[in-house]
């Protein structure tokens, strides 16, 4: 019989199990490692059982598992920033026990920056996985003084963006909609505020971020390029506390505390911006007339009902309002809520049930002249799933489950405003269901070999009511070739697709500090964003697979070599990847995508490929840390002419909108003293592809008509930028209130990075190119942060 005892001090002996119980060959000790002050789980803590070679590292909720025979041991637990914990164990049977760590107390003066001796990059089975803790993100120089998940993510190998003000991020050259973004299980369709300058994730509530860009576990699906899984931390179940910050552009606040001490907690956070005063001081008249505002609210509650049952709920709401001069206004909002129930059965089975629902709405207002109007589109979803985790033996793990998404899309509604002459128009709602079953196996074959193999089967159905247009066979789809239509009733299946998605990863350890990893995964995408702009905008519509539009499919391959030096103080890797895409969606030249009742006439089907090399180097030495990553990648597309569609670029391969061959990030951090630090980040990338006029002809000596190049044959200027930050604090560490002050400078050397290029031509003169720089100047900021 297992016996769970209360926490003991380090000087006492901890007796686990019953001394008169039936002896077993192998005993199991499970539990969690927590912060003694606030009860927060500590992921990444290292447990070592002396005098054996038994080790474990806590997972995201602080859980661990150690297997040992009956005996007397010394358990050592260590984690960066905490006092090392040692306690003597007398183990007689299976047991469950939680251990508490205390923050490390350091006198003012020089401090050495060290990483926990973590060889997870070498020993983990998955390739192409990046984990970002909030501590790592806080070490980077910040835009307007605030830690930001998406900006930190863009310092990772293989991750780029279209430029300043871009909505989302691109992984290995993929589109922004090809990333599955989850926040505590909630689907996120637009992850940014202020048209891309801030992410919607409240930084003081984030526990950690994991990006899967190569090896993707079978429990994830629905996107071609990557999975971004953002986990929010649980509230303090020991005492009431709070933290926040006040900056020149936004402020934030988090409050947390126990609902029932040691059993249930809450945490709530809010952010709001006030950047209008900055716009009022701009040189541009249009900018002085502009307005920008956003807010977000996030709440989370967790409770342990019993030793084996836990429930939780997360909810968030965001709103953005941006008006450019007296011409156009954007509004977009997200609201979502998620519930989970976890049940431990015995010591080897963990069951989880989840349910969440959400909505994303965007509005575009034309506020100029006699054509004032409001364009609206909306996405609603309902999502649920069950999964089970089973570990029959120490070296084998099995996870299986099922989930379903139900989508309702309102692709567009146009309404006149203030008595304008705009003609109302509305597109009918679209509905679809996506049902998946998955099986995930992970097996430690030997000390040198670990294998992960999984399979995911997904079925998609597009549902009525819907009127499907039928086109003349053997010719391209146009409005002129419509011949008939089919009418489907409410809930009737209009189209269905399904497919198997195998997942495979292999790790072979070469030495104690090096390994080789192989990875393969297939993914289907049944829900895609329709946008032919340089960067997705809040009003771009999302399109379900249907009678005419097939799901996209990607096969991802990767191989990596991982090598650490000096007991993991230096970490390096080299990864090669290749992606093959089928049924890729592209667009005709000058395609009309908004309020199009037959959007399939503007779409083209092709194939794509992406390939590249990622190089990473990280070194901690003394008070300094240096990180470098470089990516070489190409992302190409091909749309060939056929009897049913036109081609692009004569059927040749051409660069995608996000093809940026070279990307380099350099990050430096200096812990000057315990209460002061300096950081600097430099980023460089090749300019995005663009299409440009190469010649022109004059009609009637009056009208000059430009002739454009093939698609994406030119590039805008290269992007590069240097940011720095200096932080003083925290001070008041011995008191209840702790403070810090950060001075940051974004774009230190005033680089006018081009977001896009446009062309103008005066009569009888050559074409002139002009760059559009969203942030073409230096941006200093000061931020006051506090904790209590």
Question: What are the language-model segments listed below?
Answer:
Residues 11-22, 32-34, 40, 45-50, ...:
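Short, acidic, small-residue-rich periplasmic hinge/interaction motif at the N-terminus
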Residues 381-385, 426, 430, 434-436, ...:
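Outer membrane beta-barrel strand-and-loop segments of large Gram-negative receptors
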Residues 577-580, 599-694, 785:
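Gram-negative outer-membrane beta-barrel transporters
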Residues 302-319, 331-478, 570-578, 612, ...:
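Face-selective signature of the C-terminal outer-membrane beta-barrel domain
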Residues 52-63:
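Short, acidic Ser/Thr/Gly-rich low-complexity loop/linker segments typical of extracellular
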Residues 524, 581-582, 675, 684-702, ...:
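C-terminal beta-signal and adjacent terminal beta-strands/loops
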Residues 361-362, 408-419, 461-484, 508, ...:
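Surface-exposed extracellular loop regions of Gram-negative outer-membrane beta-barrel proteins
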Residues 83, 95, 117-177, 182-216, ...:
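Periplasmic N-terminal accessory/gating domains of Gram-negative outer-membrane beta-barrel systems
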């Amino acid at each position: 019989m297992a016996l769970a005892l209360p926490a003991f001090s380090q000087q006492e002996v901890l007796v686990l199990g019953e001394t008169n119980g039936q002896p077993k060959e192998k005993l199991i000790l499970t539990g969690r490692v927590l912060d003694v002050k606030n009860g927060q789980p500590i992921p990444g803590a290292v447990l070592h059982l002396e005098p054996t070679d038994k080790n474990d590292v806590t997972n995201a909720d602080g859980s661990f598992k150690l297997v040992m025979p009956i005996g007397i041991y010394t358990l050592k637990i260590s984690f960066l920033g905490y006092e090392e914990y040692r306690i003597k164990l007398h183990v007689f049977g299976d047991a469950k026990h939680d251990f508490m760590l205390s923050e490390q107390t350091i006198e003012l003066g020089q401090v050495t920056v060290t990483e926990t001796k973590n060889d997870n990059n070498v020993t983990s089975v998955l390739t192409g996985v990046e984990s970002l803790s909030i501590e790592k993100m806080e070490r980077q120089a910040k835009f307007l003084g605030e830690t930001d998940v998406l900006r930190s993510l863009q310092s990772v190998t293989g991750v780029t963006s279209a430029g300043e003000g871009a909505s989302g991020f691109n992984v290995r050259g993929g589109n922004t909609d090809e990333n599955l973004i989850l926040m505590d299980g909630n689907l996120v369709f637009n992850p940014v505020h202020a048209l891309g300058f801030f992410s919607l994730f409240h930084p003081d509530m984030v526990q950690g971020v994991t990006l899967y860009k190569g090896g993707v576990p079978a429990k994830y699906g629905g996107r071609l390029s990557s999975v971004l899984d953002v986990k929010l931390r649980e509230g303090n179940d020991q005492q009431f506390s709070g933290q926040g910050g006040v900056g020149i552009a936004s402020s934030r606040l988090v409050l947390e505390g126990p609902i029932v001490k040691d059993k249930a907690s809450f945490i709530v956070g809010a952010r709001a911006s006030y950047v209008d005063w900055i716009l009022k001081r701009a040189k541009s008249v249009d900018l002085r007339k502009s307005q920008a505002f956003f807010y977000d609210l996030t709440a989370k509650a967790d409770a342990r009902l019993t030793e084996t049952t836990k429930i939780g709920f997360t909810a968030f709401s965001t709103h953005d309002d941006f008006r450019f001069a007296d011409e156009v206004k954007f509004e977009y909002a997200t609201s979502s809520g998620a519930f989970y129930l976890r049940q431990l059965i015995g010591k080897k089975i963990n069951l989880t049930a989840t349910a969440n629902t959400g909505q994303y709405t965007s509005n575009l207002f034309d506020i100029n002249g006699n054509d004032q109007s409001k364009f609206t589109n909306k996405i609603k979803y309902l999502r649920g799933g069950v999964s089970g985790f089973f570990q029959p033996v120490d070296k084998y793990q099995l996870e299986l489950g099922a989930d379903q998404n139900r989508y309702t899309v309102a692709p567009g509604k146009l309404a006149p405003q203030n008595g304008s002459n705009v003609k109302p128009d509305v597109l009918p709602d679209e509905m679809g269901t996506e049902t998946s079953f998955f099986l995930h196996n992970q097996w430690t074959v030997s000390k040198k070999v670990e294998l992960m193999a999984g399979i995911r089967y997904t079925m998609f159905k597009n549902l009525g009511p819907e009127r499907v247009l039928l086109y003349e066979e053997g010719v391209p789809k146009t409005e002129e070739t419509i011949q008939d239509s089919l009418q489907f009733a409410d809930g009737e299946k209009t189209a269905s697709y399904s497919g198997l998605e195998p997942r495979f990863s292999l790790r072979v350890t070469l030495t104690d500090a090096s390994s080789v990893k192989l990875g393969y995964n297939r993914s289907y995408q049944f829900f895609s964003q329709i946008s032919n702009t340089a960067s997705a905008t809040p009003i771009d519509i999302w399109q379900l697979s249907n009678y005419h539009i097939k799901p996209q499919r990607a096969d991802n391959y990767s191989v990596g070599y991982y090598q650490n030096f000096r007991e993991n103080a230096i970490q390096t890797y080299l990864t090669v990847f290749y992606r093959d895409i089928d049924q890729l969606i592209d667009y005709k030249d000058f395609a009309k995508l908004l309020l199009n009742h037959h959007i399939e006439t503007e779409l083209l089907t092709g194939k794509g490929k992406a390939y590249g090399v990622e190089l990473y180097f990280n070194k901690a030495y003394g008070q300094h840390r240096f990180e470098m990553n470089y990516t070489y990648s190409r992302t190409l597309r091909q749309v060939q002419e056929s009897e049913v569609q036109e081609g692009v670029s004569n059927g040749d391969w051409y660069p995608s909108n996000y093809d940026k061959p070279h990307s380099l990030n350099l990050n430096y951090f200096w812990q000057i003293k315990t209460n002061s630090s300096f950081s600097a980040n430099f980023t460089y990338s090749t300019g995005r592809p663009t299409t440009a006029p190469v010649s022109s002809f004059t009609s009637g000596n009056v009208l000059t008509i430009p002739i454009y190049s093939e698609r994406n044959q030119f590039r805008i200027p290269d992007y590069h930028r240097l940011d720095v930050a200096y932080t003083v604090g925290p001070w008041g560490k011995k008191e209840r209130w702790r403070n810090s002050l950060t001075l940051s400078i974004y774009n230190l050397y005033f680089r006018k990075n081009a977001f896009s290029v446009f062309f103008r031509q005066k009569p009888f003169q050559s074409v002139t190119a002009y760059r559009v720089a969203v942030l073409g100047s230096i941006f200093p900021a000061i931020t006051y942060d506090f904790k209590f």
